[in-house]
């Protein structure tokens, strides 16, 4: 397929990005993708410390347990992404995104109050399942909100913003854990998804 590109060569990349951030739906979804990636990666750095100190796990098993928990969340996220087509036949995409973000926020609180490692892992996997809906649906909604000939620049900017979330999540969660304790990371991540 070939498209006739209608982008003015004199128009700067920054002005193109600004023009799309004026669209409320695009701005909201780009922010959501940033916060989603921020929340997904934010728990990673504190998870071993949380399991070791608050759940009193033996040092030799902490890395294995954390690996299993992260794998479970990733696996369930992939399963959710695969099943989006069937779910969008029954529910609207905005409703799925809204439900998924609230479910993830609730599940982060449940992860914090779980007294056992396996309960934490189960709730993390379920949170991963709901996270698997957010990114593909948000990207689809963004693509519907912008003209075809300008999607490349928009998705380039969206990818950059999502990567910033991946980088800032661990940095800020480490700072929050240092200042307020590991529990504050779970609560602040939940708050991000409730926003």
Predicted regions and their residues:
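Interfacial helix-cap and linker-helix signal at transmembrane-aqueous boundaries
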Residues: 51-52, 87-88, 175-181
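A membrane-interface helix-boundary motif in multi-pass transporters
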Residues: 175-193
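Short amphipathic helix-loop junctions that connect adjacent transmembrane helices
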Residues: 46-64
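Structural signature of the two symmetry-related core transmembrane helices
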Residues: 95-110
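Pair of pore-lining "gating" transmembrane helices in MFS-fold secondary transporters
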Residues: 23-43, 125
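Intracellular juxtamembrane helix-capping segments at the cytosolic ends
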Residues: 133-146
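Juxtamembrane intracellular "pre-TM" segments in multi-pass secondary transporters
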Residues: 2-30
């Amino acid at each position: 397929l070939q498209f006739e590109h209608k982008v003015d060569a004199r128009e700067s990349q920054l002005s193109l990005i600004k023009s799309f951030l004026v669209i409320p739906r695009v701005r909201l979804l780009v922010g959501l993708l940033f916060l989603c990636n921020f929340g997904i990666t934010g728990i990673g750095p504190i998870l071993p410390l949380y399991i070791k100190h608050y759940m009193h796990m033996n040092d030799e098993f902490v890395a294995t347990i954390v690996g299993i928990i992260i794998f479970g969340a990733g696996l369930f996220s992939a399963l959710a992404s695969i099943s989006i087509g069937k779910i969008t036949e029954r529910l609207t995409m905005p409703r799925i995104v809204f439900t998924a973000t609230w479910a993830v926020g609730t599940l982060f609180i449940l992860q914090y109050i779980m007294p056992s490692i396996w309960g934490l892992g189960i709730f993390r996997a379920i949170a991963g399942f709901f996270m698997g809906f957010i990114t593909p649906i948000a990207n689809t909604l963004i693509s519907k909100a912008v003209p075809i000939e300008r999607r490349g620049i928009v998705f380039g900017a969206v990818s950059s913003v999502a990567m910033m979330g991946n980088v800032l999540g661990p940095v800020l969660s480490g700072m929050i854990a240092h200042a307020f304790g590991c529990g504050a990371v779970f609560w602040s991540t939940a708050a991000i998804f409730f926003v």
